[in-house]
Regions:
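Bacterial Sec-dependent N-terminal signal peptides
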Residues: 4-46
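C-terminal domain-boundary segment and adjacent tail
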Residues: 57-58, 64-65, 107-118, 269-284, ...
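CE4/NodB-like, metal-dependent polysaccharide N-deacetylase domain
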Residues: 145-151, 161, 209-210, 215-219, ...
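Catalytic domains of cell-wall/extracellular-matrix polysaccharide-remodeling enzymes
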Residues: 217-299, 334
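C-terminal beta-strand-rich structural cap/linker in extracellular carbohydrate-active enzymes
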Residues: 394, 425-447
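Beta-rich interaction/scaffold domains
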Residues: 443-489
Length: 489
């Protein structure tokens, strides 16, 4: 199931009425977001194909032939759900991302913001990442409760992810943030901005959120060559801001197929989403790479209709089960309730049947599955070797797969070890064999260390502790992992 969220451009109400806003106009109160936020070094991720070795020590030699392969969906999940939020909306951060990752959530109920001219004025209040860091939050913010996700089939949490579109050519993505803890005379600093800034993009990407092109600043949006040119301009800005990271997805804006035509000719864009003229995604039929394929999505504002679609696809025979592909312009309290409902029914607090990644992560996994290979061999009576080959394409950042190995059970295993190409590893029984989750991200240990360090700065922050445990939990067993866990306790 794919969900997409889209945004409408707004008047910039950020600064409000300067005469009434005494706190926060001083430049000393502002943070330049791009100077503050850590980002996983995507630009220095593994280059070139990956060949990973897994070594399984067993009690006795297997009595049946061993077979290995990658399932259609990661973690052997039977249901695919994808969420894409268009137009670079601020709510992607302070609502969608926040709700998934156990952070305070921006309340969409209007809050009193009276002025002399408008004593009954109300407004929805939002926050930025700089506000969250400093504890400067709207007065009606919804408190952090829990994280939302599923498991990897071995008991480890895998939080939901989604895609946000970027407006990379817009200057407002570089906007400063007015941070003023304790100031309550007015709340202009929490009024909705034009969109996300790069600070929020970086923080969300650290948690698995994907990015996509959307509108570009072409004068003629019906000119393929001009749109291609602006893809390049936007891509350069993205690389500059995101440590060399590129964007490989397009969410078609405004029903304009010229963007699709331009994307087909623009090398970096590999996966697309559209409301029409695309292909429905049937994950259990996908035998090709889906490269340069525009996947159909739909916009649905009635949450009950989305629930009905999820129920219908969950009941459908596997081969006929579609990914539910939904677009939405803005997320509010009702959308947060929908995410919680998905978690409670199909996630880790339900039947644990859903895989909820970003579209680009799904695209990569399907590419690895259809173009990579797994070789299994018994090197001696007590050792089985798995060799996993992953072909790395341009702009690939999620080298992580599930491998099923039949003919062997967890109870038969003495130990599982891997070579240095593997940074994360977990396994468990699955059907008539075992499943192994193999992560080959180059900087996964450094990434986990960052979140441990964030927790060490404030050990009273329960959400930061949950983050530290979550990211350290991704690592394969090692002395380094043990040392990081000891720092959290």
């Amino acid at each position: 199931m794919l969900l997409f969220t889209s945004c409408i451009k707004q008047i910039n109400l950020y600064t409000g009425d300067d005469e009434q806003h005494e706190g926060g106009n001083n430049d000393d109160d502002k943070e330049k977001p791009q100077e503050q936020t850590y980002l996983y070094p995507f630009g220095n991720e593994v280059q070139g194909d990956i060949t990973a070795g897994i070594f399984i020590k067993v009690k006795d030699a297997p009595q049946v032939p061993l077979e290995a392969g990658m399932p259609c969906l990661k973690y052997n999940k039977p249901l695919l759900l994808l969420l894409v939020q268009d137009d670079c909306k601020q709510s992607a951060y302070c609502r969608t991302w926040a709700a998934i990752n156990g952070k305070p959530v921006s309340n969409s109920d209007p809050y009193p913001t009276p002025t002399v001219q408008e004593p009954d004025k109300t407004a929805q209040l939002y926050y930025n990442s700089a506000h969250l860091r400093k504890g400067d939050l709207p007065p009606n913010v919804l408190p952090a409760v829990r994280t939302l996700g599923s498991t990897d089939g071995t008991g480890k949490e895998v939080r939901f992810a989604f895609t946000t579109t970027l407006s990379a050519e817009e200057e407002w993505m570089d906007q400063d943030v007015d941070v003023n803890p304790g100031y309550e005379k007015d709340y202009y600093r929490f009024f909705m901005k034009r969109g996300l800034n790069w600070d929020e993009i970086k923080e969300m990407m650290n948690y698995g959120v994907g990015i996509a092109f959307h509108d570009v600043m072409a004068e003629n949006v019906n000119d393929v060559e001009e749109i291609k040119q602006h893809y390049g301009i936007a891509q350069s800005k993205i690389q500059e801001q995101l440590a060399g990271r590129k964007c490989k997805m397009l969410a078609r804006p405004n029903g304009n197929d010229t963007y699709i035509d331009a994307a087909l000719q623009y090398e970096d864009i590999r996966t697309m989403a559209t409301e029409s003229n695309g292909e429905d995604l049937y994950p259990f039929r996908a035998i090709e790479s889906l490269d340069k394929v525009a996947l159909n999505r739909s916009f649905e504002e009635v949450q009950e209709n989305i629930k009905d679609e999820i129920r219908q696809q969950r009941r459908a025979p596997e081969r006929n089960r579609k990914a539910v592909h939904i677009g939405v312009h803005n997320t509010d309290n009702d959308w947060i309730k929908l995410l919680e409902w998905i978690n409670d029914n199909y996630g880790k607090d339900g039947d644990d049947s859903v895989w909820f990644p970003s579209q680009e992560e799904y695209y990569e996994y399907n590419y690895y599955r259809t173009h990579g290979n797994v070789k299994v061999e018994q090197t001696d009576e007590h050792t089985i070797k798995l060799t996993v080959h992953l072909p790395i394409g341009e702009c690939f950042y999620y080298p992580s797969v599930t491998v099923n190995l039949s003919g062997l059970k967890k109870e038969d295993i003495v130990s599982v070890e891997s070579d240095d190409a593997v940074s994360g590893l977990s396994y468990n029984n699955f059907e008539e064999g075992i499943m192994l989750n193999i992560d080959c991200r180059k900087h996964l240990a450094e990434h986990a260390t960052h979140f441990v360090e964030q927790y060490e700065k404030d050990r009273s922050n329960a959400s930061n502790k949950a983050d530290a445990l979550y990211f350290v939990g991704m690592l394969k067993d090692s002395e380094r992992k043990t040392a990081l866990l000891n720092r959290i306790q």
